[in-house]
Amino acid sequence: MFNFLKRDNGKVISINGIDSLLGKINLIDVREIYEYRNGSLKTARNIPMGNLLNNPDRYLKEEDEYYLMCQTGSRSSLACRRLTKEGFNVINVRGGIGAYKGAKRK
């Protein structure tokens, strides 16, 4: 149903699978505030990666599921690996906002 891929570094969703989920998921943009202000997905909450990793319990609940994105998917992938090790249910949005802006939207 959803375009998930399982990798050694955790769960990943293709940018093509995100449109139908917007508004139904906990989407976190881990870019810095200045990057986020230059454009993000309208339902994304901005929590810079450093803040999120330094204090995940402040922002996340272990029983909930979160989708993490950044500009290219690299930072969010790193964050997902660490948060998964800490017991959080996170999914990396592969390609990030850069791929989203570059992809044809339906």
Name each region found by the language model:
Residues 1-16, 21-25, 33-65, 74-106:
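Rhodanese-like catalytic fold shared by cysteine-dependent sulfurtransferases
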Residues 69:
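Short, surface-exposed ligand- or partner-binding patches at beta-edge/loop junctions that are enriched
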